[in-house]
Amino acid sequence: GTAPKRMIKEWLENRSDKHLFEDSVGNDPSLMDVIKMVHPKPTNKNREAFYAYLLGKTYDATLLPLNVQEFEAFKKTPKGTRTVPNVPFQMLTALDLSTKEWTEIARNAKWHMTRMNLNTFERHGVFNENGMVDLIATRLRSEKDIKNAKVFPYQLFVAYMTATSAPVKVRNALQDAMEIATQNTPKITGKVFVGVDYSGSMTAPVTGNRGTATTTVNCNQVASLMAACIMRNSDD
């Protein structure tokens, strides 16, 4: 309908170039799909060049937003001699990056991104770089960051179970973070009784059997974790 399209056009017009570029990460639909669907009218030459860039058309590179220019220059510069641009992590992972560049990404990563990419950092040698193990461990167990991230214990439990090759300091930090994250779970008032099902079916993975997409965490582990969180936050 015309009303939804008009709303999307207004959203595109009011979105800054920086944020719009960050929004271009992802598919189904992609930002390119959205632009093709609503046909927004550029308000200036810079936005016209930016839309052309996002649509894969010919554009004037000098009119592109600064972060887009930096990203394109980064891709054309030999690895090891360039500065990592301030763009979403997902835009960089498909590129051929040096250990130095991966280390820079890890050093500047937000809390959630750090938690979700421990194996990636390990695989690219980040933990072998001076000071990075302590930096990552300190970030992971930061009480302030854990509360701001509103992370739940099960997310940290999954990270712990999958980061089997991470340094001991990092894995210990995940355990500390898990304990702190219990504060992010709801508190139930009154007398609380917890009964955990330990029948044979509870040994199944949480995701079910999905081939390579099967989680390493099973149902009884999640049930036990939920029970522990309730006990931590309940007085009786």
Predicted regions and their residues:
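Long lumenal/extracellular ectodomains of secretory and single-pass membrane proteins
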Residues: 1-218, 232-236
